[in-house]
Amino acid sequence: MSIKLVAVDIDGTLLTDDRRITDDVFQAVQEAKAQGVHVVIATGRPIAGVISLLEQLELNHKGNHVITFNGGLVQDAETGEEIVKELMTYDDYLETEFLSRKLGVHMHAITKEGIYTANRNIGKYTVHESTLVNMPIFYRTPEEMTNKEIIKMMMIDEPDLLDAAIKQIPQHFFDKYTIVKSTPFYLEFMPKTVSKGNAIKHLAKKLGLDMSQTMAIGDAENDRAMLEVVANPVVMENGVPELKKIAKYITKSNNDSGVAHAIRKWVLN
């Protein structure tokens, strides 16, 4: 059965190390679209952090979709209509916020509107995230967060501090939440039902596609869930070694237009 849905991660996959979309990748995406293939961005970023990429790839028109917040939100890329939205509760927020204080690491919560932190001394990686995803930062005390629609929370800090903190997180948190380390300085907390994999399942069903018609392309541990559910998992040459063990195909690196290579070799052929 031919591949009709291709989910593509952004950082380390779609983009080069200097954060560009190569001409070759752009052309391959257009070729796939012309053959009726749904090319879908699947990212941990919020929608504000991918709008410019959707525009560059011409994936912001009728019939296009985007997976954001690692699967916490699936939207129509043209209208913004929400197909899937899974939120953390206020109790989830409090529990995770107070854990971060106990562990001595910075924390922020993300909604569709912005990045919220209770850290009076705002962490540099919160500022980094704000710049990366083009979202404002708001300082709010925990008491002021009661009515916020939180899609994910992030512990953010220096890699050595974060690694030490991770070792002290009680097992209860791993049982209750989906927890992924998306970069050496980001640890993301989401509802247990949230993953890029579940988002792809929802989207494939909406589009009337069988999972045998799906492909995912990624490079990092937060791509594992989507690589495990699709029939055609593709890992970048620059991907994590453990991830390559579950790949059906290994494509070229992100700096060598690996997404274009994968689309042309295994989707359009």
Swiss-Prot record:
GO MF term list: magnesium ion binding; phosphatase activity
Cellular component terms per the entry's GO annotation: cytosol
Residues that bind Mg(2+): D9, D11, D219
Enzyme Commission number(s) of this protein: 3.1.3.-
Needed cofactors: Mg(2+)
Residues noted as binding phosphate in the record, renumbered to the chain: I10, T43, G44, K196, N222
Residues of the active site: D9
UniProt similarity note: Belongs to the HAD-like hydrolase superfamily. Cof family.
NCBIfam families in UniProt: Cof-subfamily, HAD-SF-IIB, PRK10513.1
Annotated protein name in UniProt: Putative phosphatase M6_Spy0533
Source organism (scientific name): Streptococcus pyogenes serotype M6 (strain ATCC BAA-946 / MGAS10394)
Lineage: Bacteria, Bacillati, Bacillota, Bacilli, Lactobacillales
